[in-house]
């Protein structure tokens, strides 16, 4: 009778296989479990523990090895009792849920693709393709029109063969944003970006943009490419106010190019599984998140702070962190 009365307790004690294999004996097994550590109910992680586990899983560690499991368990023990087996089975169940959700998303995507393919073919024509078809009207023979996305809008650029005598001239409504220099004695090619600019603006800008590449003799000039990418001058200056000499124009463009290469002031990191823009360098953790919190890396390492609540090391781009409350 004693063994049968203890059997339900063993079946509801967390579901670990060692306890279930040990519970098939007689009443002596129940006596050992009663004499040792009391059998607890199924482990229910606390919100802080769930947050830590989810952050570690989302960082890419979906199947931690044994030593990492021990580290995670020690980190979770700050907020409640937990064992290595609990951590192991949590990651096992989380992987199963993730795979099941991925299969459901793939099935939904396949159904949506099948529904889209069964619709009328005329609906598949995109606005960019339609605009490309309109730009092709009036192009010279041999011109190839491509579609290119720039700044959220669709632009087309034509690749046109040209000789050294005609490489400096451009179309009436084209801006030479990308160019490949033509040799002094051979034929070359350049790319003209047709972004809907007016004829007057393009006629003023195109010679300055293409002249640097033609003068370079076909060599790869990084500063000329940077000037063609939009670093010709200040946006407030008109094209007519640019210097007349190529050397002074090149110097001004180089200075403008280097002045635009400042590092980003913020970086993107994941905090509690949410992408956030954080300042680069030292961070005032107390002023940003409060007094009683600490920042932990997804590997379980606690980020050190000084006496004033300032992080001693900078956050890394793309890394995953999570905020946890300090234990009382």
Swiss-Prot record:
GO cellular component, one term: nucleus
Start-end of Gly residues biased regions: 23-33
Name used for this protein in its record: WUSCHEL-related homeobox 6
Location relative to the cell: Nucleus
GO biological process: adventitious root development
Short name of one Pfam family: Homeodomain
Name of encoding gene: WOX6
Region called Disordered, residue ranges: 1-45
SUPFAM superfamilies with a match to the protein in the record: Homeodomain-like (SSF46689)
Main localisation: nucleus
Keywords, comma-separated and alphabetical: Developmental protein, DNA-binding, Homeobox, Nucleus, Transcription, Transcription regulation
Gene3D superfamilies: Homeodomain-like
Keyword Kinase assigned: no
Organism (species): Oryza sativa subsp. japonica (Rice)
Biased composition (Polar residues): 1-11
Free-text function comment from the UniProt entry: Transcription factor which may be involved in developmental processes.
GO molecular function per UniProt: DNA binding; DNA-binding transcription factor activity
Record feature DNA-binding region, as residue ranges: 38-102
Family the entry assigns: Belongs to the WUS homeobox family.
